[in-house]
Every structure is written in C-alpha cells, then in structure tokens.
Amino acid sequence: MKKGLFIVFEGGEGTGKTTAIDAIYDWITENNFECIKTREPGGIKISEQIRQVILSKDNKEMDAKTEALLYAAARRQHLVEKVIPALNQGVIVLCDRFIDSSLAYQGYARNLGIEEVLSINKFAIGEYMPDISVLFDLDPKIGLARIANNDCREVNRLDIEKLEFHERVREGYDIVYKNNNHRIVKIDANNTKENVINQIKNILRPKIWTNIK
C-alpha cells in the first residue's frame, strides 16, 4: 500500500482556509480517495485541550515562548495519534495549519526567531513534513474584515492582536515560503470561493492522482 499524502493549508486569520478544506475534502472523497480533515492546534482530545489554553482571550499574559512550546506540544500529540496512523494506512490527510504557522506567528511575528522555533518543532515532529503546503496569501486588513463580518466564528486571542502583528505574520509566511518553495505553493486568497477552490484543485490534482492511484 502506498503511503498517504499530508496536505497542509496555511495562512493568516480570515484567509478562507477552513472553508477551502471543507470543499477540497468533498472533492477528494467524491473521487473515491480515502481522506480525513483535521486542524491545529487540535484534532484530538489532548491537543484540543491545549488549543483552549492557547487561544483563550483570558490568557493575554501568555509568554511568547510558552505559546510556541504549547503549539509544539499539541502538534506532537496530534501527529503521533492521528496524522501518522492515517498516512501509514494510505489516507490523504488535510490539515488546517502545521509547522509553518509556528514559524510565521511565533518565529517571526513574535520575534522568537524562525530558526529557534524551527528547532523546537523539529524536536516535536522529527522528519514528518507536509508533502505539500498551500499558503493562502491575503492582505490582513481584508482577512480581519472577514472575521468581523462572520458571526459564526468565535473570536480568539490571536484575532484581537493589532493589525501590525497580522502584517508581520504575512511577512513571516513570505519568508518561510521563499525558503521552502519546493513544498509550499502560494495562492491569491483575494478571490471568489470558486476561484480559490479551482486554484487548489489544479495544484493538488497531479499530486493526488500520481501518488495515490
């Protein structure tokens, strides 16, 4: 049996990742591939509990290093409990965020250093990296406006950061992308939902049909 595919969706707040994952999941399963969708931090009981600590608006005093370590801990447990077993069974895994989020948010936007945060996460995940990461690129002003207009979304601690923080997140993602463009594909998220989904399908189609079928 062939190993599955680990596909990650990355981007700032309000870029449309979650909506896109739902649509891509439907597309993949309609084509008779076995697929699961999951998220970070979260996806399993322990990591969801860590998520509540990280994202709670009550924890405004959280230190940046504490934040980075909590993300890495949640990532480790999610990886070994959910992602690796699925990949070993030949399943396509769609994950909302992975290591690149930590590099952009904590490494760059929080000024901890991309290499330092990479080191923490390498300890957590070992050699497990995404087969492909889709980076949703969007002006943070547009992303935050989308969040403000979305009554269904629960606002978390990162959502209420100042615009300057979100601009640094975007800059951080751009650095990570340039250093990893062998596995990261950037798309323009300032488009219609249909256009964004079609961009992703065109990126993933050859990868899925070549490696799984």
From Swiss-Prot:
One of its GO terms (molecular function) is ATP binding. GO terms for cellular component: cytosol. It holds the Pfam family Thymidylate_kin. Its EC number is 2.7.4.9. It catalyses: dTMP + ATP = dTDP + ADP. The keyword Cell membrane does not apply. GO terms for biological process: dTDP biosynthetic process; dTTP biosynthetic process; dUDP biosynthetic process. CDD domains: TMPK. Phosphorylation of dTMP to form dTDP in both de novo and salvage pathways of dTTP synthesis. This is Thymidylate kinase. It comes from Clostridium beijerinckii (strain ATCC 51743 / NCIMB 8052) (Clostridium acetobutylicum).
